[in-house]
Curated annotation (Swiss-Prot):
GO MF entry, a single one: RNA polymerase II transcription regulatory region sequence-specific DNA binding
SMART domains assigned to the protein according to its UniProt record, in alphabetical order: GAL4
Feature: compositional bias, Polar residues: 38-55, 137-223, 269-293
Biological process terms in GO annotation: cellular response to starvation; gluconeogenesis
Keywords noted in UniProt: Activator, DNA-binding, Gluconeogenesis, Metal-binding, Nucleus, Transcription, Transcription regulation, Zinc
Signal peptide: none
GO cellular component: nucleus
Function noted in UniProt: Transcription factor which regulates nonfermentable carbon utilization. Activator of gluconeogenetic genes.
DNA-binding region of this protein: 69-97
Gene3D superfamilies associated with the record: Zn(2)-C6 fungal-type DNA-binding domain (4.10.240.10)
Name of protein: Transcription activator of gluconeogenesis acuK
Subcellular location per the Swiss-Prot or TrEMBL entry: Nucleus
Keyword set includes Transferase: no
C-alpha cells in the first residue's frame, strides 16, 4: 500500500471522550505515517542521515517526558518536558500548553490536586502558591484556568449557589480564637451576603484592603499567623520517608503513620494535656462564625440557622472566643446553677449518701461518706450560671460569649499520695528466701473442712480436690528447692502488681492462693463483709463465730452447717492462728461446695476461663455481734435500712447483719505460674439488686 492510499484510508476518529479529534492531530498522524513509510522503503533520508524508523537500533532515543501536555495527551502523542513543547509550538498552541491531568490512583482520591503538583509535595498547606490558587468544584486546587467557571459549590446549596472564599481571610472579628488549632486548617467564613456572593476566581484578582490577607501577616495583626497545620508532613511525626523503600510518597506516609501509631499505642497522655483538659494538642478545630446574624455560615444549615456541628446545646455554644491562650481550664461549675436540681436533690437531710469507692487517680483510699456528697469539686464559679439559666441560647445580654474553661486540677492531686508505698519490685526478690509450705496449708484446710462441714458436704469437697491431686503431683514432682523459691517469688511479684489494681478498681475484691488462703483484700470487701484486712491476712486474731447456721440452736437438732464443737483444745486456747483465713470461712456451706467443684474443672483446664455465679458471704461476727443482732435496737436499724436505703459505709457494713449472710454475685478466675500450676485466684464480688436477682441465668 502506498502513502496516498494510507492517507485516504485515515479518517478522523473520536478520542476516548467521544469528541472528534482536531484536524491538526490528524495531520500529525499522517506525517508520522509518511516518515514511517519512507524509512521502511528507502532506509535512509535523501541527505544521507540516519532513518527515523522506530525499529532502527541506531536511531536516537527520545527521552520520555514526566508528564505530557494537555494537547499531546489527547492526541496520544509523545511529548517533552519543556513548556511549551515542540509540538504545541509547531501547531501554534504554545500559549495553551500546560500539563495534562492524570487519573488519580485509588489511594490518592482523598488528596487535593494541588498536593500532587510537582514541587509541592508535603508542603501543600505551607506553599506560597496555595493562597493564589482557585478552587475547583470539588474543593481542590484546579490546574486549569478554564475550570474556574465550574467552581463555587458551597457547603449548603443556596438559591444563588454562591461560592465561599475559604483560604482568603478578611478582617478578624473579636470573637475569633486567639490560638492556632493543629487539628485542621483555620476557616474564617464570612456570613454577610456580600462576602458570600464573591466567587473564588474573582477574589484572587481583586486587591485586598486587609494587609493580613495580601501579605505575610504578623502575629500582632493576625492571631492566626504562623504555618498552617499540614497533616501530610512527615516531619510532624519524626520519621524520614527517604529511608523507606517506597515508590510513592503517600504509601510511605501511610506506612510510617501506622508505625508511629503502633509505637505510641502504650504511651500515656502527658501531664500538660491533662491539666488543659484538651482533646488533641491545643484544642479543637477552630471555626470563626457569627451565629448572631441571620446568614448561615460554615457549618450552618439554611433551614434552621443553627450550627450544624453543635446543634442547640447551650454548653457547647458557650465555647470561649476570647480567653487567654495560656489559660487552659474550663469552668463547668458555672454552667449549671447551684440552686437548681442538684441543690434541691442534696438538700434533704434524710437522703442516703452515695457510697464513694474511689476519689481520684492519685489516691488509692476511699473517701469518707461525709465528703462524698459535696458538690463543689474545685471548680471556678462566676456569673455564667445566671446567663445560662435565663438565656435560652446560653448567650449573655451584650452578645459576647463568656469563657468556659476546663476544671483547674490541683497540683497536689497529680502527685502521689502519702499512703502509697514505694514501688520497688526488687524488695520482693530480696525478701523471699524460703519456699511456701503448701503441703502444711492443705493439711490445715482439710482439718478445717472436717470440723466445719457435715460428712456429706465434706465428701463432695474431698472428691473435687481428689480429682486435681494427680495433676498437682505430676507438675511438682520435678521441681527442686530453687524452683519452689522461684515459684514463691513469682507469686509475690504478681501479688505486688495486683495490689494497686485492687485499690484502684473500687470493686470488692480478694486474691487467694491455690490453698484458699487470703493473700490480698480490698477495702470495699472489708466494708461489705466486716472482715478486717489484718484478720483476713492472719495478722490479728480471728474471733469470728459465724459459720452460716443459726446463732441460737433449735430444740432437738442443730441446723445444717452450724458450728460444731469439734475444735481442738489448743485452738480453743489460742484462737489467733498464725495463718491467713481460708476462703471456705467466708462462704456458706453450699457456696463452698460449688466453689471447689468449679475449681476442680478450672484449675488445670481453660487457662483463660472464668466462673460467674452467686454465693452468700458470711459476715464477721463475734459473740458480742451475735447478741446485738437479737436486740431491738438492731431490729429498728434494719427497718431504717429498708426504708431509707444505704447511708454511707456504715450502711454497707450493716448489710446482712441480721442473718449474717450477704447474697452476692461473683466472678473469679485462676492465674497460673510459669510451671503451669494454679498460682492464685482472683475474685470480684457484686451486690445484685432485686431486679438483677430475678434475671441471673445461673
Amino acid at each position: 500500500m502506498n502513502v496516498e492510499a494510507k492517507e485516504s484510508s485515515v479518517a478522523p476518529a473520536g478520542d476516548h471522550g467521544g469528541a472528534v479529534q482536531d484536524p491538526a492531530d490528524v495531520r500529525d498522524r499522517l506525517e508520522l505515517l509518511k516518515n514511517k513509510a519512507n524509512g521502511e522503503t528507502n532506509g535512509a533520508t535523501p541527505n544521507g542521515t540516519k532513518s527515523t524508523n522506530a525499529k532502527d537500533p541506531s536511531r536516537p532515543r527520545r527521552k520520555k517526558a514526566r508528564r505530557a501536555c494537555f494537547a499531546c495527551q489527547r492526541a496520544h502523542l509523545t511529548c517533552g518536558d519543556e513548556r511549551p513543547c515542540q509540538r504545541c509550538i509547531k501547531r501554534g498552541l504554545q500559549d495553551a500548553c500546560h500539563d495534562g491531568v492524570r487519573k488519580k490512583a485509588k489511594y490518592l482520591h482523598d488528596a487535593p490536586d494541588g498536593a500532587l503538583m510537582p514541587g509541592v509535595g508535603g508542603n501543600f498547606y505551607n506553599h506560597p502558591m496555595r493562597h493564589n490558587m482557585p478552587l475547583s468544584s470539588n474543593g481542590a486546587n484546579a490546574v486549569n484556568a478554564t475550570s474556574q467557571q465550574n467552581s463555587g459549590a458551597s457547603f449548603y446549596p443556596t438559591p444563588q449557589s454562591n461560592p465561599y472564599n475559604v483560604y482568603q481571610e478578611s478582617t478578624l472579628s473579636q470573637n475569633s480564637f486567639p490560638s492556632q488549632s493543629p487539628v485542621s486548617p483555620t476557616f474564617n467564613m464570612k456570613n454577610t451576603a456580600t462576602a458570600r456572593s464573591n466567587s473564588l476566581s474573582s477574589s484572587v484578582n481583586q486587591p485586598q484592603s486587609n494587609p493580613a490577607a495580601s501579605g505575610p501577616p504578623s502575629q500582632s495583626q493576625n492571631p492566626f499567623a504562623g504555618p498552617f497545620f499540614d497533616p501530610s508532613d512527615p516531619a510532624l511525626f519524626n520519621f524520614d520517608l527517604s529511608s523507606m523503600n517506597f515508590e510513592n510518597r503517600y504509601g510511605a506516609l501511610e506506612f510510617g503513620m501506622l508505625g508511629h501509631m503502633a509505637t505510641g499505642a502504650g504511651d500515656s497522655p502527658s501531664e500538660s494535656a491533662t491539666q488543659r483538659g484538651s482533646i488533641g494538642r491545643s484544642g479543637s478545630a477552630q471555626f470563626a462564625t457569627t451565629p448572631i446574624t441571620g446568614n448561615p455560615g460554615f457549618g450552618e444549615s439554611p433551614g434552621n440557622q443553627q450550627p450544624f456541628m453543635f446543634g442547640n446545646d447551650p454548653l457547647l455554644n458557650e465555647w470561649p472566643n476570647n480567653h487567654p491562650p495560656g489559660q487552659g481550664h474550663m469552668n463547668v461549675g458555672g454552667v449549671y446553677p447551684q440552686n437548681s436540681m442538684m441543690a434541691g436533690h442534696l438538700s434533704k437531710a434524710d437522703a442516703p449518701h452515695a457510697f464513694a469507692i474511689e476519689s481520684g487517680p492519685a489516691s488509692f483510699s476511699s473517701p469518707s461518706a461525709t465528703t462524698s456528697p459535696h458538690v463543689n469539686g474545685g471548680y471556678d464559679e462566676n456569673a455564667l450560671s445566671n446567663a445560662v439559666a435565663h438565656k435560652p441560647n446560653g448567650l449573655p445580654t451584650n452578645g459576647q460569649r463568656p469563657a468556659i474553661t476546663t476544671p483547674r486540677l490541683k497540683h497536689q492531686s497529680l502527685q502521689l499520695g502519702v499512703k502509697r508505698r514505694h514501688r520497688n519490685p526488687s524488695t520482693v526478690y530480696e525478701s523471699v528466701k524460703e519456699p511456701y509450705a503448701y503441703t502444711n496449708r492443705f493439711h490445715n484446710l482439710t482439718a478445717f473442712i472436717q470440723r466445719r462441714f457435715s460428712s456429706q458436704k465434706t465428701l463432695q469437697i474431698a472428691k473435687a480436690l481428689a480429682s486435681i491431686r494427680p495433676s498437682f503431683i505430676a507438675t511438682t514432682k520435678t521441681l527442686n528447692r530453687d524452683d519452689l523459691i522461684f515459684m514463691e517469688k513469682c507469686f509475690q511479684r504478681t501479688l505486688w502488681e495486683y495490689e494497686d489494681f485492687i485499690n484502684a478498681c473500687g470493686t470488692p475484691t480478694i486474691v487467694c492462693r491455690r490453698t484458699g488462703e487470703i493473700a490480698a483484700v480490698g477495702k470495699e470487701f472489708s466494708i461489705l463483709t466486716g472482715w478486717k484486712k489484718d484478720v483476713l491476712l492472719g495478722k490479728e486474731p480471728n474471733l469470728n463465730v459465724n459459720t452460716g447456721g443459726t446463732s441460737i440452736p433449735q430444740s432437738g437438732t442443730s441446723s445444717r452447717g452450724s458450728f460444731t464443737p469439734r475444735i481442738s483444745t489448743l485452738e480453743q486456747a489460742n484462737p489467733a492462728r498464725p495463718q491467713p483465713v481460708f476462703l471456705a470461712e467466708l462462704l456458706d456451706d453450699d457456696s463452698v461446695v460449688d466453689f471447689y467443684e468449679d475449681f476442680a474443672r478450672l484449675a488445670f483446664g481453660d487457662s483463660r476461663g472464668s466462673v460467674m455465679t452467686t454465693c452468700k458471704l458470711l459476715k464477721y461476727k463475734t459473740k458480742e455481734d451475735m447478741e446485738l443482732a437479737q436486740s431491738d435496737d438492731n431490729q429498728r436499724w434494719n427497718n431504717h435500712l429498708r426504708k431509707g436505703g444505704i447511708a454511707g459505709e456504715a450502711g454497707m457494713n450493716q448489710l446482712g447483719f441480721k442473718d449474717g449472710k450477704v447474697e452476692c454475685a461473683y466472678c473469679w478466675t485462676v492465674k497460673r505460674d510459669v510451671f503451669d500450676i494454679p498460682m492464685l485466684i482472683v475474685m470480684n464480688y457484686l451486690i445484685p439488686s432485686d431486679g438483677f436477682k430475678s434475671s441471673i441465668p445461673f
